[in-house]
C-alpha cells in the first residue's frame, strides 16, 4: 500500500494545501510506493523526435524543483515536467496562495513561480540517470528587467539536461507575463528562443524540442495569432492550456473570488475547446499536449479525440489519488480492446469538429 493511501485523502485535506503537497513530495522521496506500472506498446507515442512510453504526463507545478524526478515514474506517468524554473530563486507570492475548491474538484493557485532557481535545479538534474522523459518548464523572474532574456539564457543553461522545454508565458500570477502572448511580443520571443536553441544545437550536437504553453483565456483572434506564429516558427508543439482566470460555473462560494489561476474539473471544457480550435488552426503535423481537468480515462481520451498527441494532469491527482495515471491507462486499454483499436494515436482528432465549434465564453 502506498504512503499516500496510508495517510488518506481526507487526512491530507485537513492540512494546509502547501503542507499536504510537501508531505506528498516527502512520501515519494521515501520510496513508499507499490504501484504496478502499465507497459503496453499501444500506449506509446512518438512526437518531436521523442518516444514516450505512454501518453500521460505529470504537468508542471508538482515537482517544481526536480526533487522527485524518477519517483513520479513509479506512479505510471510516461513523462514528467519540472518547474516552472526561473533564472534566480524566487519565494513566490505571499501565503495563503493555494486553495482547494472541494465542491468543484478544483484548485486556485497564485503561487508566483516559487522555485529554487536554475542553478540548484540544474545540479539535481546533471549526471542523473532518469527513468523517462523529463521536460523543463521555464519562466521569467517577477522582477526581471528583460523577460525574453530570462527565457533564452535558461535554454542555454538547461540544454544538456532537458529532454524538451516548455516556454511558460501563460501563468496569470506573474505581472505582465501573459502580455508575451500578444503577437508582436510573441514573435520577438519565439524568434529569440529559436535562435538560442539553434546556437545550443550547434554547440552540443543534438536537438531539444520546444513547446509553447498558452492560456485558455485567449480570444479567437489571439488564438489565430498564436497559430500563425507557431507556423512561422520552428517550435515543435503547443501545450493547451495553463490555468484560467474564469470562474464560470463554480459552486464554491467562499473561495471562488480568490485571485489566481483555476485548475481541475471546471477547466476541462474550456481547455478542450481551445485545444480543438488550435488543432484546426495548426493542422495535423504540429504536436499538441492537452492539459486541464483530466480526472479519469474518459476525460483523458476526450483530450486525444479533441486533437492532443499527449496529455498532462496534476489537479486530478489531488482529488483522485496518486495512482490516477495507472488507473487511466488500464481503462484506456479496455476501451481500445472494446473499440478494436491498436494504438492510442488512432483516437486523435475524432472529435475535433465537435469541440472546435463551441464558442469561447468571456
Curated annotation (Swiss-Prot):
Q: Which GO terms describe its cellular component?
A: cytoplasm; plasma membrane
Q: Which cofactor does it need?
A: FMN
Pathway given for this chain reads:
Pyrimidine metabolism; UMP biosynthesis via de novo pathway; orotate from (S)-dihydroorotate (quinone route): step 1/1
Key words, A-Z: Cell membrane, Flavoprotein, FMN, Membrane, Oxidoreductase, Pyrimidine biosynthesis
Which residues hold substrate?
Answer: 64, 109-113, 168, 173, 242-243
Biological process terms in GO annotation:
'de novo' pyrimidine nucleobase biosynthetic process; 'de novo' UMP biosynthetic process
Q: Which reaction does it catalyse?
A: (S)-dihydroorotate + a quinone = orotate + a quinol
Q: Which cysteines are joined by disulfide bonds?
A: none
What Enzyme Commission number(s) does the record list for this chain? 1.3.5.2
**Subcellular localization:** Cell membrane
Principal location listed in the UniProt entry:
membrane
The cofactor binding remark recorded in the entry reads: Binds 1 FMN per subunit.
Record bears the keyword S-adenosyl-L-methionine: no
| Membrane topology listed for this record | Peripheral membrane protein
GO MF entries: dihydroorotate dehydrogenase (quinone) activity
Q: Which HAMAP family match?
A: DHO_dh_type2
Oligomeric form and interacting partners: Monomer.
- UniProt similarity note: Belongs to the dihydroorotate dehydrogenase family. Type 2 subfamily.
This chain's protein is named: Dihydroorotate dehydrogenase (quinone)
Species lineage = Bacteria, Pseudomonadati, Pseudomonadota, Alphaproteobacteria, Hyphomicrobiales
